Amino acid sequence: PAHFKNYIDMCDEESCHVMIKEIYEPHYERFGKYFGNTFRGFFSDEPCFANNIGSYYDTLGIPSLILPWRNYMIEMLAKRADLSAEEAELLLPGLWYEVSGKTSRLRYAYMETVTHLYRDNFSRMIGNWCRERGVLYIGHVIEDMNTHMRLGYGSGHFFRALDGQDMSGI
């Protein structure tokens, strides 16, 4: 959807660093003396991959769905799917279309890959930044309408997305 066109890239470490620098750091510079006492934490509300077409129900296998991707992911995907990098690359159309006998393994490996990147480059990064400054990282990962296990409005893997948070909120 159009409201996500300038949204952060959850898989990209640099993108998350920019978000911290531009949003979190100015708060710390201005209100640092209140961190850990008046300010108890930072709250993120429904962070997501934002790659959906407009429905909560978008899943892998929709031909027009844009998927989070970085070139280095092919090696990660191959390892998780127990394939060579060349095999994994040839099977990439299986993220959108059925590939006889290979679709499930490829899609599972893809979801594992992007949700680990989300955890490492978003949730843990923000959580570490907060704890280093004496505040909690509190967040609400959307879980309704089955988005807890999807991209789009979701974070791919509900519990992995919580990894890095000190507590959940609503």
Model-assigned labels for residue ranges:
Residues 1-170:
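Catalytic-domain carbohydrate-binding cleft regions of carbohydrate-active enzymes
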